[in-house]
Amino acid sequence: MRWGHHLPRASWGSGFRRALQRPDDRIPFLIHWSWPLQGERPFGPPRAFIRHHGSSVDSAPPPGRHGRLFPSASATEAIQRHRRNLAEWFSRLPREERQFGPTFALDTVHVDPVIRESTPDELLRPPAELALEHQPPQAGLPPLALSQLFNPDACGRRVQTVVLYGTVGTGKSTLVRKMVLDWCYGRLPAFELLIPFSCEDLSSLGPAPASLCQLVAQRYTPLKEVLPLMAAAGSHLLFVLHGLEHLNLDFRLAGTGLCSDPEEPQEPAAIIVNLLRKYMLPQASILVTTRPSAIGRIPSKYVGRYGEICGFSDTNLQKLYFQLRLNQPYCGYAVGGSGVSATPAQRDHLVQMLSRNLEGHHQIAAACFLPSYCWLVCATLHFLHAPTPAGQTLTSIYTSFLRLNFSGETLDSTDPSNLSLMAYAARTMGKLAYEGVSSRKTYFSEEDVCGCLEAGIRTEEEFQLLHIFRRDALRFFLAPCVEPGRAGTFVFTVPAMQEYLAALYIVLGLRKTTLQKVGKEVAELVGRVGEDVSLVLGIMAKLLPLRALPLLFNLIKVVPRVFGRMVGKSREAVAQAMVLEMFREEDYYNDDVLDQMGASILGVEGPRRHPDEPPEDEVFELFPMFMGGLLSAHNRAVLAQLGCPIKNLDALENAQAIKKKLGKLGRQVLPPSELLDHLFFHYEFQNQRFSAEVLSSLRQLNLAGVRMTPVKCTVVAAVLGSGRHALDEVNLASCQLDPAGLRTLLPVFLRARKLGLQLNSLGPEACKDLRDLLLHDQCQITTLRLSNNPLTAAGVAVLMEGLAGNTSVTHLSLLHTGLGDEGLELLAAQLDRNRQLQELNVAYNGAGDTAALALARAAREHPSLELLHLYFNELSSEGRQVLRDLGGAAEGGARVVVSLTEGTAVSEYWSVILSEVQRNLNSWDRARVQRHLELLLRDLEDSRGATLNPWRKAQLLRVEGEVRALLEQLGSSGS
């Protein structure tokens, strides 16, 4: 997986649009603002505000208050109510934004966008070539602050109309929301009254006539009594017209007549035209935002200043954004209060790793040039490293990201087809993405891109749509490759976006072979005329003795079935390719897909296996995950809002084809990372019935060595927690589990018969969760392995509370858990509280003779205990002999294993002991292990010297050889 930039957008509410983005510029600095309105706030409680500017250019502190233009108390109160309503309205954040915590709001902290002034000559130049279209804005153009937009121009003329333009995702909606909130909180003192309009809202009114006063009064009720005074406000009245591309404006007098009366009913587009002509309210200030393709809808003579909304022009601004985002106090807290909040140290670590990757990985820096991709990076990191809200998937993050940027957007409002911008992107960019996945490449030449964009274009209207897409949205999806040796090529802005769009291209049914296209047309034609022809042929067959007619009659019926089977075969082929990609074993990228995604964002700590030889074969393991995720009901509903509906029947048939292939390949034993990818696919699909059927044959869950982050624990618990059949074994050894992960995985543990939690650094705190697990009435665990965890005596005291009330556990391993004498004495005192235990392993716990002997005696008296492991403890020669004698003293009672020998014979448990040593050789203290092995070797030599039985001597010699080999291995690895 590899790496690109923008900030998202959502609706303002009923008819308005809003976004969540914060662009900026080069040298950020902080300004702490105070309230300018007569020394007091316009409304609301005190609120700290920090502004991070995108440029070093800033205006002076707000000047003193102008003379009041609305002198009456009632008018002042009406405007104050208007401020309060706007602030409440524009402060609302979409659900996707709220997951970052309530403190990240536009009225408390903000990174100002970079706005670079441009000229009409630049806008009228011919469109740049594809390669140049993706270049950042020229550094020489002066940046503008929000407060400077209406400053006099270079000739000293007053600027009344400002047009701000930017491609999809540069943050036009967020800029408008921020500007409105600035005015609400008194930070734009130059304007007495601000009236925002959404052009999308106005376009939805159609040709129904309404006056400007009616439009304002309908949307902002408190302003009814201020409307007669609007003309007197002059330049202190600011209209904000957001999303001009949604309106069809005609500035010809023949098309739109002149009108200066704000109370005269007209079409909404005519009102906007006369406002921009300065024929209606000629002194009012107007701010317009639009996509680049619609700039020409306003003649340049009516515009005082053009400004391009740009992205984060250097990595310092990107770092600032990430610090603000990821260091929010509630950033790591799960929705609904579940899970554990990320600590400040963990958040700082994420920011530091991301900063290092931004400095060393130029492609991700190029991606984050667009602020909305910075949002996507933060959302992905939040998903990967924080407790995940129920139902949130990686696919839903990407789908929501596209909804925030494309919701309600049509490609061209003047085109009668009203084609969705996202639907056009799915058809063109999806084709390019899928061709890249199928040919296993992520770099595309200009010919590749043009080939997908221009495929099938035949009419002038289609070329016009392509031109609009290239100007408004192409660089949202594609970025120039900045890697050495890749000049002139393009990559998808974010690597995962290629796989998402490829999956979308498939599930939307846009990939069709020539045979399928022809077959579909033939089948539809036959279907339309088939009934009539069949009726005629049926009559003729009865009247005329023609034997060929029944055959022809049946052939007509067969044609739709043949086409249906052809489509079904195509779906099966896609499912086959998807499943093969999911279970494809890689030599280089063998981490699970979530770790791969995290590494692509944060970088890889430490050297790669082959630093000078990157893999030639690209990995597209997210592609099948996104395919499953896009078929989920939630994502299909969001895609329908974007103009990309997936039919229920198509989703069902695709799911059935995938299930058929998964049922065959899913039965094989998978490596831990591949098994997690399999479970992650089911998590993305969000269909419990589907997952239960496919995973019904899963009996062993082996995720040993997989780093179980909060999201991975959530994935495993969500997919396997609701299953009914028992799991023979759950192996989570060396998974970096913590108590929060144990709590998340509780539903899975309740299905397990054998549970392995070795090498997880679980301490006494985790024993509380293990106690609750053992006391659960559905617990069916028979074997519990907790070796190589620092449980200590305090943890075992808690664990014994669970064992006292548990009736299922028969085998318990506490090998190398730091129990010491205190822990073994505690076990000896409370062992009789459990009546089912059959085997107890407390080897390598640093216990002495007294504690070990006490536990051995308690074990001998236990009604069910059969085996007690005490080897590798700090036992003297006399202590070992006493324990050996105790273990074989009488019939019945537990056998005590303290050495590789039993008298003059080899212990039948010698292989168990040595295999434990071999398995933990790299994690145990080498000097201590070497000392214990030397003691065991001495026991073997003594036993061999004390026996005359040649068979026993041979066995002892064999075991001696195994011990010596381990000692040599210790010595060589130590050196």
UniProtKB/Swiss-Prot annotation:
Alphabetical keyword list: ATP-binding, Host-virus interaction, Immunity, Innate immunity, Leucine-rich repeat, Membrane, Mitochondrion, Mitochondrion outer membrane, Nucleotide-binding, Repeat, Transit peptide
UniProt cross-references to SMART domains, sorted A to Z: LRR_RI
Stretches assigned to the LRRCT domain: 906-970
A GO biological process held by the record: negative regulation of innate immune response
LRR repeat extents: 695-718, 724-747, 749-777, 778-801, 811-834, 835-857, 858-877, 878-899
MF annotations from Gene Ontology: ATP binding
Sequence segments annotated as region (Required for interaction with MAVS): 75-556
GO cellular component: cytosol; mitochondrial outer membrane; mitochondrion; plasma membrane
InterPro entries recorded: Leu-rich_rpt (IPR001611), LRR_dom_sf (IPR032675), NACHT_NTPase (IPR007111), NLR (IPR051261), NLRX1_C (IPR048900), P-loop_NTPase (IPR027417)
UniProt binding sites for ATP: G166, T167, V168, G169, T170, G171, K172, S173
Domain NACHT: 160-483
PANTHER family: NACHT, LRR AND CARD DOMAINS-CONTAINING
Comment, domains: The LRRCT domain mediates homodimerization and LRRNT mediates trimerization of the dimers.
General function of this protein: Participates in antiviral signaling. Acts as a negative regulator of MAVS-mediated antiviral responses, through the inhibition of the virus-induced RLH (RIG-like helicase)-MAVS interaction. Instead, promotes autophagy by interacting with TUFM and subsequently recruiting the autophagy-related proteins ATG5 and ATG12. Also regulates MAVS-dependent NLRP3 inflammasome activation to attenuate apoptosis. Has no inhibitory function on NF-kappa-B signaling pathway, but enhances NF-kappa-B and JUN N-terminal kinase dependent signaling through the production of reactive oxygen species.
Protein name: NLR family member X1
Species assigned in the record: Homo sapiens (Human)
